[in-house]
């Protein structure tokens, strides 16, 4: 082999492989390869993925310190117009070069002034070429509706529309026979809930649906009814003083739910029969929160229902994996008639902060008979006398007789949890860390079958980590002799491995 001569090894690769490699580059980078040789120009014309992002083109460069005031603003506007025109010409040129070759993905991200007429032409062009993955992320002023042909595509498999301040969806006919994934972000529907229903009715094999930051608090109703749906992200634009009127779900084959919304006035239908994993962030309005605070101050929390989310909570009771935000804990306390039985639940994650108490946590644990892993994202919670026996702010700890009675039953003593994880334990060693250590000890004293405690301590101070580790490891009063400790920090990971914990050799 002659190593003295340079060889163009890459150009010798098969054209199909080169096109595949180019498809991973953004379109500006891929287009730059066309100047290498005539072969590369033809290769670029066959690239199946096009990714246009005006932020890549609209870079103004460094500011000239000699130019300021109105002259600088004028220069910026002129330069911005030039770059915008350059971007539009580039997109036109690429689409013209590719002509009618097959197209897999077309992604368009726009944050600046681009001619809407040209945008529509680009969309129609790629639809004519049979694009299967269309992503439009546009933040610009566009008063009309999106092109109706988007919703009459025989080839689209994935569609993502994020058009903040942009066009709205107004469809009379929807025919998307191959669409499996639909993302709708910050989009306005001309006919509100009716418009959404119309859109979904034309997606006969849809499996994944993302509805994010849509103002359905202003709608008469919002409904998702799809028997083919498997994954749903339902994220409302939560308003401080508004609640949705009516929300319903008929999704019997759904297995994954990500839910963020204010409590609706009613949940007329909730069908999550196949649900396996749910992330729930359900929130009260400001007025509802104020009502709960007033009830607490008056000592009248019992029976105080400021809203009713019972039907929604009942609908998720079949899950195996459940993530609850701190606001959802509050909803379970003040907006749920009773906590249902979570018979299938094996993994529960609870978020906590100083503004919300643990009143509902005790009921959750009592009604989760098969729970194996319990995760707390933070241990700090609002001090109250209504946390029950979950924590150390329980009112009966001041009663010496009950404190001395080791047989006092607690929700923890019947808790089947084997793995306890504490995330965001703290950052610096102070009095608050001591309180959290006491809370962890309380868990260890009461949970009978715990086999592993994993604690994440967000500190770079190794001495503090060792101090916490030793306190927990040497704690003598532990319900389970099988429990192993692992403490993870920024720099360290300490583990008792196979050795028995807390003074047991």
Swiss-Prot record:
Q: What is this protein called?
A: Putative F-box protein At1g58310
Q: Please give the InterPro entries that the UniProt record associates with this protein.
A: F-box-like_dom_sf, F-box_AtFBL13-like, F-box_dom, FBD, FBL60-like, LRR_dom_sf, LRR_FXL15/At3g58940/PEG3-like
Q: Which Gene3D superfamilies match?
A: 1.20.1280.50, Ribonuclease Inhibitor (3.80.10.10)
SMART domains the UniProt entry points to: FBD
Where does the record place the F-box domain? 7-55
Annotated coiled-coil segments of the chain: none
SUPFAM superfamilies found in the cross-reference section: F-box domain (SSF81383), RNI-like (SSF52047)
